[in-house]
From Swiss-Prot:
Any Pfam family: 4HBT
UniProt record similarity statement: Belongs to the thioesterase PaaI family.
InterPro entries membership: ACOT13, HotDog_dom_sf, Thioestr_dom
The protein's name: Putative esterase PA0474
EC number: 3.1.2.-
Keywords per UniProt: Hydrolase
A GO molecular-function descriptor: fatty acyl-CoA hydrolase activity
Length: 134
């Protein structure tokens, strides 16, 4: 049985890729911004025993993309046109990894968001994304 921190619920949407990597969880923070999270498992790790950069990129893209899509009423799907990820630390098996998102700007066709990936107080990565409303 996986230990999930209080306040987190299963992620409200999924996909074949997320089903392979998950389970993913989410909640809103005190500023009503989306937080997406998962518990790091061996399947998420590289040969060095830490969470793979591709997983961190996927987690950032999921968190930022969902935050952007659900920042509009009604929610609207958006397409990632740019994603930047800066690695600042590592996540290990058993770590609870959270992506704290922030919507920076919503335009008519383009939107911008940023995120910080944390394991507890430890910063693992920072990310920014640009999204297009098709």
């Amino acid at each position: 049985m996986m230990n999930v921190p209080e306040g987190f619920q299963p992620l409200f949407r999924s996909s074949p890729l997320l089903d392979l990597l998950g389970p993913f969880f989410c909640r809103q923070d005190a500023q009503r911004q989306l937080v997406v999270a998962l518990r790091i498992d061996e399947k998420h790790c590289n040969h060095g025993g830490t969470a793979h950069g591709g997983l961190l990129s996927t987690l950032a893209d999921v968190g930022l993309g969902y935050a952007m899509a659900f920042s509009r009423e009604p929610p609207q799907p958006m397409v990632t046109v740019g994603l930047r990820l800066d690695f600042c630390g590592v996540a290990r098996v058993g770590d609870w990894l959270e992506v704290h998102t922030r919507v920076d700007k919503l335009g008519q066709r383009m939107a911008f968001a940023s995120a910080r990936l944390h394991s507890g107080e430890r910063l693992v990565a920072s990310a920014s994304g640009v999204f297009h409303l098709p």
